């Protein structure tokens, strides 16, 4: 899909009300790096390359405005940098805040660190399993995860990182209602559902005050 930079910019403005030229330039550079590296390592599905801007970058960008006032973010299973790198780009423009990225794949770690270095982003990559990061980072204000695990497993993973004020923003597809039902057997939590601005069948689950029912 041949889309001009101006068209990309207008599409982004539909997601995030104000976007600086610096932010837009960084997002374009990130898109370029994704395409370069994807020829050698699997960062995104080949089927989504023609719609990379919409399917991955805009899908990630819609996360940030939900809680742009928070400064300390953490993304679990960061993979190709969605939504983590996109959030880091917005934090850079704000000139405040930081995001921790947790990823176990060495090749993807190399990619993420390259992007962070080239774009001078306020982000740190932790090369470890999620369970091993609990003692390495400060408990965040916001936790994100995209396509990582079912909700029940995600709540188990994020539980040690939570405070009473922590919010989790978890992107989910068409089966989200089933995941909520299954997770509710083991967890109690406050929930807000935000409809995705990119995919009508997807949502962003805003979860807080997580309590285990397992005793």
Curated annotation (Swiss-Prot):
Q: What is its main location?
A: cytoplasm
* Localization annotation: Cytoplasm
Listed A to Z, the keywords are:
Cytoplasm, Methyltransferase, rRNA processing, S-adenosyl-L-methionine, Transferase
GO MF annotation list: rRNA (guanine-N7-)-methyltransferase activity
Q: Which domain of life, per UniProt?
A: Bacteria
User: Which EC number applies?
Assistant: 2.1.1.170
Q: Does the keyword RNA-binding apply?
A: no
A single GO cellular-component term on record: cytosol
Please give the catalytic activity noted in the UniProt record: guanosine(527) in 16S rRNA + S-adenosyl-L-methionine = N(7)-methylguanosine(527) in 16S rRNA + S-adenosyl-L-homocysteine
Show the InterPro entries listed in the entry: rRNA_ssu_MeTfrase_G (IPR003682), SAM-dependent_MTases_sf (IPR029063)
Please tell me where S-adenosyl-L-methionine binds in this chain. 77, 82, 130-131, 146
Keyword match Cell division: no
Q: What does it do?
A: Specifically methylates the N7 position of guanine in position 527 of 16S rRNA.
Q: Which PANTHER family does the UniProt record give? A: S-ADENOSYL-L-METHIONINE-DEPENDENT METHYLTRANSFERASES SUPERFAMILY PROTEIN
Tell me the protein family, please: Belongs to the methyltransferase superfamily. RNA methyltransferase RsmG family.
Q: Which HAMAP family match?
A: 16SrRNA_methyltr_G (MF_00074)
What is the protein name stated in its UniProt record?
Ribosomal RNA small subunit methyltransferase G
